[in-house]
């Protein structure tokens, strides 16, 4: 027998550097190596002695490089497969792509095996309780199993793919997974109680010791493979240690199934397990490939003489999904890609990828779960046509982006408020349910019907706001606590008004104004609002007491009843303004009179005059008239202004209240 020898200057995997020396007085010019010193294990070479010198039983010559002698000189090509192409996580998938890329035919031989005529249903039963998480399950059986090492060619291919050879039966399942991309599992029939396989959800308190020797607690949302009594595998992740293949196994049950990808990923993540099987299942596999994979495993069993396959399979098939049908429009694809590819060439390309073209529809093959929309079809055409063959096109000039009318209106409102001396502020769109109590909102108010946040940062940010007033008061209170003597603020933000349990809320924009200190009073706030409305070109507005527009703005309960008003444009309420109620003011800890307003920006934008009507300058100078009136204290100024305007007609330009005495 020949043995591996490391000559002077060689570096071994363990970090050992071979140099000339003396061993027991004898000059040493190298070292005979064991498996461990070469970084190999008995699984790689089952016939070798674990601790002694490695005796090479392969066909080799003296002086031959050890890599070549034991089959480690093969070239490995590493592919980085993106998560949207699980069909390429296999040799067959890559061969399919290579055949199309190089324009060669793909000659895939359908697996065949003879098998015994034994009736499998007499010794095995399969039941799938959760057909949503396992729409397809196929079981096959191999009798008179002969456990032993796999042939050299299989071991070398497994090693080159990063898989450790174990024994012929386990190696076959791994080999088929690498070849077809479909994970398989093998059970020892002796440990499948009553010959019954049940695919079900785990029960509370159940546990399983997996093949890695770890005991893992299961939860009801996890899908498992069980026998009549206990779990024997975690579906799509790893098998159980108890039912695994052993040296004295006589009968094996092969499993080939399709498990729902999201469920496999959640289970693997919760158990802290990442296996080759789960990595494939969680990306989505070809449900049509289960039977082909199982047949290939049986073919290899016969080829290696590892046992006697049973020809009959037991299959549970509850698939309801149909192949995706995607619109096919060659003209759109050419416009999308900037190409001039003929329909015939596109059809030829797509059919070479097993994508059927039926008129104006493409039918996706079962293994291409990434094909969903026309852009995906265009991508297939482009990558086979060659990205470097797509001509460069000059970017076409496009019109400069313009603000929408709504954005222009909001921008103008902001600019006007800044021009009036107000500072902009920005608050969170979520708030606390307690804010309604702080402004004295009635318990049955519709504003208390809010959208609850599923994962809030805390109780103070647990709902979406239905009114912007509390947010403005929070900012004013913060400024007051920080000893800002005079503050004038505005905010343009959204309110979130629920529309139904399964629909998105309405999100109207609101302009909220808040001020205190300095020259702040009701009339200063009213003057700012009037200046804003005039700049935004709203029709003549009037003011009424909140009691005359009851129920329109429920937040008016937070205002002083005698120093507040609802703003009307025509007959339409567009906002309110007034002094904060002393009780609310005290609740927020503000020690001075505070004034607030809220305007319905969205409604105002719809009512604003879109066009400015030109009027020539008057030929005659304006005449100012002072009118002194004696009237009841309860008479609103708006009523007097309305009477004057009606009496004066078109000649009147403006009415202004300038003194009360």
Segments (PLM) and residue ranges:
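Phosphate-backbone binding interfaces of nucleic-acid-interacting proteins
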Residues: 1-118, 272, 276, 280, ...
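Conserved catalytic alpha/beta cores of large enzymes that bind or transform nucleotide phosphates
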Residues: 36-37, 43-45, 54-56, 147, ...
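A carboxyl-terminal module marker
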Residues: 352-355, 499-507, 512, 519-661
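Flexible, glycine/charged-enriched surface loops at secondary-structure junctions
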Residues: 103-115, 165-172, 301-316, 358-359, ...
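Terminal amphipathic helices with adjacent charged low-complexity linkers/tails
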Residues: 98-129, 305-333, 337-340, 377
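Extended, well-folded interaction surfaces typified by the phenylalanyl-tRNA synthetase beta subunit core
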Residues: 326-485, 661
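Short, hydrophobic beta-strand segments
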Residues: 74-82, 135-143, 276-283, 320-337, ...
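Conserved mixed alpha/beta core segments that line enzyme active sites in large multi-domain catalysts
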Residues: 1, 155-156, 167, 173-242
């Amino acid at each position: 027998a020949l043995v591996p020898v490391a000559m002077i200057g060689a570096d071994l995997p363990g970090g050992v550097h071979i140099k000339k020396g003396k061993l027991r007085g004898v000059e040493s010019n190298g070292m005979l190596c064991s498996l461990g010193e070469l970084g190999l294990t008995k699984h790689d070479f089952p016939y070798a002695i674990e601790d002694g010198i490695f005796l090479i039983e392969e066909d080799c010559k003296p002086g031959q490089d050890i890599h070549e002698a034991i089959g480690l000189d093969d070239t490995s090509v590493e592919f980085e497969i993106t998560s949207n192409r699980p069909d390429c996580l296999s040799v067959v998938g890559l061969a399919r792509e290579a055949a199309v890329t190089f324009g060669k035919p793909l000659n895939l031989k359908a697996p065949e095996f003879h098998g015994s005529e034994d009736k499998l249903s007499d010794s095995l039963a399969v039941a799938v309780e959760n057909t949503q998480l396992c729409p397809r399950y196929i079981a096959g059986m191999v009798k008179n199993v002969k456990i032993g090492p796999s042939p050299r060619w299989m071991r070398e291919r497994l090693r080159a793919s990063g898989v450790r050879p174990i024994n012929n039966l386990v190696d076959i399942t791994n080999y088929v997974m690498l070849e077809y991309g479909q994970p398989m599992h093998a059970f020892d029939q002796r440990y499948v109680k009553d010959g019954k396989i049940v695919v079900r959800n785990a029960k509370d308190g159940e546990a399983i010791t997996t093949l890695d020797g770890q005991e893992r607690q299961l939860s009801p949302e996890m899908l498992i493979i069980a026998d009549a009594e206990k779990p024997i595998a975690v579906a799509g992740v790893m098998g159980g240690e108890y039912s695994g293949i052993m040296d004295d196994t006589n009968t094996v049950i092969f499993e080939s199934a399709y498990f729902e990808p999201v469920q496999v990923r959640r289970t693997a993540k919760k158990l802290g397990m990442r296996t080759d099987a789960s990595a494939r299942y969680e990306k989505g596999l070809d449900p049509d490939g289960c039977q082909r994979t199982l047949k290939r495993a049986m073919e290899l069993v016969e080829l290696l003489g590892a046992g006697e396959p049973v020809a009959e399979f037991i299959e549970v098939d509850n698939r309801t999904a149909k192949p995706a049908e995607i619109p096919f429009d060659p003209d759109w694809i050419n416009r999308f890609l900037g190409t001039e590819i003929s329909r015939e060439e596109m059809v030829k390309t797509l059919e070479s990828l097993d994508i059927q073209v039926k008129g104006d529809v493409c039918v996706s093959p079962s293994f291409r779960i990434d094909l969903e929309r026309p852009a995906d079809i265009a991508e297939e055409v482009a990558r086979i046509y060659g990205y470097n063959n797509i001509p460069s096109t000059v970017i076409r000039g496009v019109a400069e982006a313009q603000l929408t009318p709504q954005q222009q209106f909001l921008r103008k409102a902001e600019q006007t408020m800044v021009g009036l001396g107000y500072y902009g502020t920005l608050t969170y769109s979520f708030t606390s349910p307690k804010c309604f109590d702080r402004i004295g909102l009635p318990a049955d108010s519709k504003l208390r019907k809010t959208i609850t946040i599923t994962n809030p940062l805390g109780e103070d940010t647990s709902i979406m706001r239905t009114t912007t007033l509390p947010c403005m008061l929070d900012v004013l209170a913060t400024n007051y606590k920080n000893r800002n003597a005079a503050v004038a603020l505005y905010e343009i933000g959204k309110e979130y008004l629920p529309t139904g349990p399964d629909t998105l809320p309405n999100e109207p924009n609101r302009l909220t104004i808040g001020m205190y200190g300095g020259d702040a009073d009701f009339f200063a706030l009213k003057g700012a609002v009037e200046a804003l409305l005039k700049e935004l070109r709203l029709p003549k507005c009037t003011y009424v007491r909140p009691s005359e527009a009851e129920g329109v703005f429920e937040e008016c309960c937070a205002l002083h009843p005698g120093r507040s008003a609802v703003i009307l444009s025509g007959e339409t309420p567009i906002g309110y303004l007034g002094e904060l109620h002393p009780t609310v003011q005290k609740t927020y800890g503000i020690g001075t009179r505070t004034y607030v307003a809220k305007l319905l920006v969205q409604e105002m934008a719809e009512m604003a005059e879109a066009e400015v009507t030109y009027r020539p300058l008057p030929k005659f100078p304006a005449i100012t008239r002072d009118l002194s009136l004696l009237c009841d204290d309860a008479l609103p100024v708006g009523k007097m202004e309305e009477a004057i305007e009606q009496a004066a007609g078109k000649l009147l330009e403006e009415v202004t209240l300038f003194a009360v005495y």
